[in-house]
């Protein structure tokens, strides 16, 4: 059984996270879990963030059950050096099966899902719903001349793409993102993890960063206030590279100070994972 979830912090050195109830909700329906595995190449970080679907029954149970069911498979696969794509999809299926077993007369609990496997050379992200993964580059690129059009975000970007009505409207060419987000139905998700979603196959993206940075997983309680990767990078850096808990705490506080209209979860994973990284404070 989980402990009090109104405010949770955890720091493993190579990864840290904060999950908070926010200002408006009576309980925290988000959940996070992460671990560090070791294989022949060095430490591998695995992490999951889930946001229980409030319109379904027992959303707090759904998110917690999903992260608990998925993290063991992620950690075991990473430690054995298994294909991270297959490991990620297997974890999603295990979480989906666990949620199927939660279904009852009151309906089918459901949750979003975003997970990561972060090794020394590669990052694998899997997702369903609108919980997000961002790559935040360590420093912005610098233009070399007045006419240079170099991307000054330095490669910071959103890795995941929401399974939401807003994204579908934009993809269909029916509206701009700003116009789509103005709709009261913008945040309606179109795919999720639960017994009533017949196709739980997650999206997967793999990439190899060219330099240092952090992978951030978060629920919409944060990105509703700062959706752009470059802005998030400017807020998180440089603390996120060596003090991930400080960065996660700062971003969670920012979301709370901005209104805290939803539950807030932020997980920060510096890349590449360092074997000498230690928690900011002794574990409880």
Regions found by a protein language model. Give the residues of each.
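PP2C/PPM-type serine/threonine phosphatase catalytic domain
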Residues: 1-284
